[in-house]
Structure formats: C-alpha cells, structure tokens
Design a protein with these regions (language model features):
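N-terminal glycine-rich phosphate-binding loop and ensuing alpha1 helix
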Residues: 3, 11-61
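Short beta-strand segments
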Residues: 19, 105-107, 139
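Short, high-confidence coil segments that cap the C-terminus of an alpha-helix
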Residues: 54, 100, 130-133
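Short phosphate-binding loop-to-helix
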Residues: 58, 64-123
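Conserved donor-nucleotide/metal-binding helix-loop-beta segment in metal-dependent transferases, i.e.
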Residues: 116-139
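Conserved small/polar residues in nucleotide/adenosyl-binding loops
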Residues: 141-148
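Hydrophobic alpha-helical segments, chiefly the membrane-spanning helices
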Residues: 153-154
Length: 154
C-alpha cells in the first residue's frame, strides 16, 4: 500500500488519543490536578481540540474519577481497564475498538502542547516517505492503514 500524500490527508480519519491514569509512583492523581483552576486533562484535551488534522480526541482511562470528570465535562473518553504499564500500551488496547485510519498518542501531561505542532507532525508524517518521527506526540496507526515498512508493532 502506498503512503498517503498531503492531498489525501483529509480523506483519512485521524483520532487523537490521550492516555490518563490516576496511579503514578511520582504524582498520583496528576490528570485532575488543577492548573490555574482547570484540571490538567481538560487543558490537554482543549489544546488537542484545536488540532485541525484530528477528527476526534478521546481520553483513555482506567479510573472512575477521570471517567466521571470526562462525563461531567462532555469530554469523549474510552474506558481501558486492561493492565497497561504505559500510555502507549493503553493506546494500543484502545485502537482495537476504535474505527480510524490513524491514531496520535498525545501525552496526558502536556497541558500547553502546541496544536500547530501536532498538525505539523501529522502532515509531515503522512506527506513524507519517512519511517519515524519523534515529537511530543507519537503517531500510531492501524496496520492496514499504512505501508508495512512503516508499521509500528506494539
């Protein structure tokens, strides 16, 4: 399968995934800690909602408190209760149940992430014949959506 060109990026369904867990050895409850009156996860979600290339942004969690916050604030979420050691593991589990061509794993503790940087990452990745991009976010995709030479096995 050929990589998609910049002209076909908009014909792809691209979903932003924000893994958010309560338990942490360094900072328990970090997603709901307030930053100038707003929880961190809300700030991350709001920034990601400004990314033009994303069709939807979904918070991934295994915690009742984070789920409740998302429900109360109309933030799309998916409950991923599997034993996931990392946010990337949580994303890998989630993409099994979400219909899309491409997924962007956006770190849940980047409340001031630049939406333009995520757009740049997506357009650069889909518009170039490159095997990897390192950025504040990591592009993930379903195996049938991209050339096998670029597939990331999780």
């Amino acid at each position: 399968m050929q990589l998609q060109s910049r002209s076909t990026i908009r014909s792809s369904k691209i979903i932003g995934l924000i893994p958010a867990r309560w338990q942490s050895s360094r900072f328990e409850g970090k997603p709901l800690k307030l930053i100038n009156g707003k929880p961190m996860i809300e700030r991350v979600y709001n920034q990601c909602s400004l990314v033009e290339s994303l069709d939807k942004v979904i918070v991934l969690t295994d915690d009742d408190r984070i789920q409740e916050f998302c429900e109360e604030n109309s933030i799309p979420y998916l409950r991923v209760d599997d034993d996931c050691e990392t946010g990337t593991d949580r994303c890998a589990k989630a993409i099994e149940s979400i219909e899309a061509d491409f997924f962007v794993n956006i770190q849940g503790d980047e409340p001031v992430i630049d939406p333009g940087s995520i757009d740049f990452l997506i357009k650069n990745f889909l518009g170039n014949d490159s095997s990897a991009n390192v950025f504040p976010s990591c592009l993930l995709y379903t195996s049938d959506a991209a050339d096998d030479s670029l597939r990331v096995d999780l």
